[in-house]
């Protein structure tokens, strides 16, 4: 496998971290996931990711020189330097994801908001192929959104251009109760279903 070039893709979620090994033409070679360790405000998440990628490189007998880098989607605003300033779902405050991953893996790391990079992926290889303007909504532990305009991600003034999950939708409820994420995320649906079951509905 050393002659061909590869890259890794990582989607960090509040429940699980999904990873993929890709050939440099975008072909998926293998995918897997690991649980998201939220202990100690997510302090072990990046080292868990690095360890899993290193294990995969060893399993495949790959030379490190055959890996172009790793792309990482984070469920929160990310600035142009790959720094996350707050990520509620993971318990992170300001975290330099790019610098930390590059130090752990000795590989280039490219970091973006998860919904933004998902929207970009849909434009290149998914349901948005052939379109240069699109909006993508992601539903998981929270609700996210990615906006592509003229083929480019709309980042907004603070990296939260598509963060529709934090829109306040109900004026009579305090944050975060009035947020879209609170009302529509899969985690809220599970809580509501569990509450309904326990009350005999």
Regions found by a protein language model. Name each.
Residues 2-51, 83-85, 159:
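Short glycine-rich, Thr/Ser-proximal phosphate-binding strand/loop in the N-terminal lobe
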Residues 15, 75-77, 140-142:
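Short glycine-rich anion-binding loops that position phosphate/pyrophosphate groups of nucleotides
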Residues 38, 42-51, 58, 65-70, ...:
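Glycine-rich phosphate-binding loop and adjoining helix at the ATP-binding site
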Residues 64-65, 156:
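A short alpha-helix-loop-beta-strand transition element characteristic
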Residues 2-4, 20-22, 30-32, 41-42, ...:
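Glycine/GP-enriched mid-protein hinge/lid loop-to-helix segment characteristic of carbohydrate kinases
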Residues 16-18, 117-119, 142-144:
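Short glycine/serine/threonine-rich phosphate/pyrophosphate-binding segments
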